[in-house]
Amino acid sequence: MHCPFCSAVDTKVIDSRLVGDGSQVRRRRQCLVCNERFTTFEVAELVMPRVVKSNGVREPFNEDKLRSGMLKALEKRPVNSDDVEMAISHIKSQLRATGEREVATKMVGNLVMDALKKLDKVAYIRFASVYRSFEDVREFGEEIARLQE
């Protein structure tokens, strides 16, 4: 860690503590050259994989896009917003757990469908109808039948 006062490279950690909910570490450091003390905060950087669309275009994972798609399916449904946020967190964890740098939109869509199936069956059908591009009533009926199994 470079000293913010003299830019020296040699610093030592005097004290380390967890901050808040334990997701951050506060470190008290001292420069070995100028002896000034300063504080740093460290957090884990959780990198999300890039998303590869069906046409081959690659784009950064967009949590807002994920949330808006789920909320559109859940519109006017009796689902707690905390449950939605937990589902989004779980989906993000599953994507990070793949260890891949890139994931297909199909995988993201399937994770969303799994989450919606647990949250609200009507929202699941709404999302599936758009995601799977249902063409007629028969396809709706088949999906509903699978849901009841």
From Swiss-Prot:
Domain ATP-cone: 49-139
InterPro entries on file: ATP-cone_dom, NrdR-like_N, RNR_NrdR-like
Cofactor notes: Binds 1 zinc ion.
Cofactor(s) the protein needs: Zn(2+)
GO BP: any one term: negative regulation of DNA-templated transcription
Gene Ontology MF terms: ATP binding; DNA binding; zinc ion binding
Sorted UniProt keywords: ATP-binding, DNA-binding, Metal-binding, Nucleotide-binding, Repressor, Transcription, Transcription regulation, Zinc, Zinc-finger
Zn finger intervals (unnamed): 3-34
Claim: Transcription regulation is one of the keywords in the record: yes
UniProt keyword Zinc present: yes
Function: Negatively regulates transcription of bacterial ribonucleotide reductase nrd genes and operons by binding to NrdR-boxes.
Family in the record: Belongs to the NrdR family.
Protein name in the entry: Transcriptional repressor NrdR
Species of the source: Edwardsiella ictaluri (strain 93-146)
Gene: nrdR
